[in-house]
Amino acid sequence: MTDQRTAWGWGLASVDAAGNTLDVWYPELKLGEAPKEVARPNHNFGNLAHEGVDVRGVRRIPVFTVSKLDEPIEDAADAYLRLHLLSMRLAKPNTLNLDGIFAALNNVVWTNYGPFAVEDFALRKLDVMAAANQSAPGLPKADVNVLSIDKFPRMVDYVVPTGVRIGDADRVRLGAHLSEGTTVMHAGFVNFNAGTLGVSMVEGRVSQGVGGGNGS
């Protein structure tokens, strides 16, 4: 019987007013058995974390996540950890159990101000614009621009792998695996649990579960 594969790390979760996890960002992840609570390293999120809600209606909470990689996904924090593993090149496509990922992830409004809950987006957008105007009345402010409404965010907002070129960041999802030497052209698209395994140029769609070899 093989040992259970495990990964762990501190993440910064965005949680809406209803208690739903909108996203989790993991700056660093480790493979192997997680340390016991008394031996855990401290997170370094500082004042990025806040228990009170911001103008988006979102709290940002540090979460320590341990993922059993051969078992189905337990929750959103677990799902985000596995997506980060793929984009950080700590796991290759089709090597992680991703059962339950769609049920674990919430549909989110992804914007230039970060993630919003879908249900009260219009009202929260007004709150954000009003707060921006109060901070510097009379000056033009960036509108709340919706980038997508989806369960999966852009990879580059969470992980920026070395040695790659990406023509259009909107077309590479978190959970894409891009090896060193990969170029994703403007028309290319790379889904989660998909990508490249060597020096490659992506000019079309790389669907979930597909990996291109060196020189493809």
Segment roles from a protein language model:
Residues 1-157:
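Terminal amphipathic alpha-helical/low-complexity segments used for targeting or macromolecular assembly
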